[in-house]
Amino acid sequence: MVAHSAAIIGTFATQRDAAMTPGSRPSKFWINWFLVASAGVAAFGLLLVVAPAFTRRGFSMLVYASPGDIDSFGAEQVRYISLVHAVLGGVMVGWGTALFHVARSLLAGGVSAGWRIIAVSVVAWFVPDTAYSLLSGFWQNALLNAAFFALFAVPLWATRDLRR
């Protein structure tokens, strides 16, 4: 399965990517930045799964400026909110893990497809999530999104020569 997945990802690489010299690879600083940011996404996702009460209090503080508001919604509603947080967390664990491996293998090797995979996935998450947050009046989540976006935007900008 892993070999098959690597072959699929490898098809994104162009002949130009294969001919890149080691000098055209991103610096270790930026690769490490991507790795830490990706691990942070996965860790945050895991926190959403394993610490439901902490997660509810955190999002309650973020949205309502009070740690107990979400828990006052009623038992069934709180259970459902915890489920949604856990599902979101699981997706974030998967996405963060994938980003980590793309950065460690493709991007670190100077393969431009690695840069594009990271950039496209971050933008594909950021735009709809942030747009809905703003349209629904939850600007606080948009601010949280902006912080996560910046974790990837900075090294993407620094390594933008690899995007071709």
Would you name each region that the model predicts?
Residues 17-49:
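Cytosolic juxtamembrane helix and N-cap/initiation of the first transmembrane helix
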Residues 127-144:
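Membrane-helix boundary connector in multi-pass membrane proteins
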